[in-house]
């Protein structure tokens, strides 16, 4: 069977198309790709911030994310996606005060994307004037609907407070100030009838920071009392990755 006659312009047309395709791909710089991915993300209603949700919805998202994390089934995330959009501002769904322990990262523990959490970290997850101001900023200017104090199992700062309390441990530098802030929680835990002293002290420390947040920061207090925000406490279990609300 004879072959069909070839169009002499066929190869040149293919070459031209290939050149155009190559140029189009080359034009997709990381910034262009990032913009495209950001544009593909769902957006809230016009005029509404991405975090304009009820405190209960924010908490629901955090706990659902933790369930995924604990089950080792986190969402697939491209941490560069949305970078260009994040240049324009932030709209986190929760502000979290957590311990500085390297084994605890709230973004991973709650399986949240970059920009979703407003995180402050300090050994023992204890409040200070600077941290109170950070939470006031988050609530007043970022519209954050949920504030969480997040302790964790086996907290070294709380354990040091127990040893200082029971064994008169001598600590160097500024550590006595840090441990001194945790001491009231240890004293309260000593009176508890059930559970071990470390676990009880960790939970009590979280509760006390939550109580302080509700009254010590005027902006946060006002928003909490008007039910614009909620303030909760939780403990992260390092062996299992699970977060338990208190």
Where are the language model's segments positioned?
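Short hydrophobic/aromatic-rich motifs at helix boundaries and adjacent loops
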Residues: 9, 105-108, 182, 192-193
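Gly/Ser/Thr-rich loops at beta-strand to alpha-helix junctions
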Residues: 102-103, 153-157
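Short beta-strand segments
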Residues: 97-99, 121, 148-152, 232-236
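N-terminal secretory signal peptides
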Residues: 1-14, 25-27
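Twin-arginine (Tat) signal peptide motif
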Residues: 11-18, 34
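Divalent-metal-activated hydrolytic enzyme cores
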Residues: 20-22, 26, 31, 39-89, ...
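Active-site cofactor/substrate anionic-group-binding motifs, chiefly glycine-
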Residues: 100-125, 130
């Amino acid at each position: 069977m004879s072959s069909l006659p070839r169009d002499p312009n066929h190869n040149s047309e293919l070459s031209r198309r290939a050149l155009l395709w190559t140029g189009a791909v080359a034009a997709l710089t990381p910034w262009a790709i990032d913009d495209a991915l950001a544009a593909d993300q769902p957006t809230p209603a016009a005029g509404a911030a991405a975090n304009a949700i009820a405190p209960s919805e924010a908490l629901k998202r955090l706990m659902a994310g933790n369930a995924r994390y604990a089950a080792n089934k986190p969402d697939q995330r491209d941490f560069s996606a949305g970078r260009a959009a994040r240049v324009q501002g932030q709209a986190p769904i929760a502000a979290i005060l957590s311990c500085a322990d390297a084994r605890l990262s709230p973004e991973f523990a709650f399986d949240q994307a970059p920009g979703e959490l407003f995180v402050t970290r300090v050994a023992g997850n204890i409040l200070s004037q600077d941290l109170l101001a950070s939470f006031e900023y988050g609530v007043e200017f970022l519209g954050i609907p949920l504030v969480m104090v997040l302790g964790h199992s086996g907290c070294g700062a709380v354990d040091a407070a127990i040893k200082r309390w029971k064994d008169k441990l001598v600590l160097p530098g500024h550590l006595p100030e840090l441990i001194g802030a945790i001491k009231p929680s240890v004293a309260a835990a000593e009176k508890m009838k059930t559970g071990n002293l470390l676990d009880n002290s960790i939970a009590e420390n979280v509760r006390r920071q939550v109580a302080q947040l509700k009254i010590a920061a005027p902006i946060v207090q006002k928003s909490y009392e008007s039910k614009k925000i909620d303030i909760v406490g939780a403990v992260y279990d390092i062996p299992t990755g699970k977060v338990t609300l208190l």
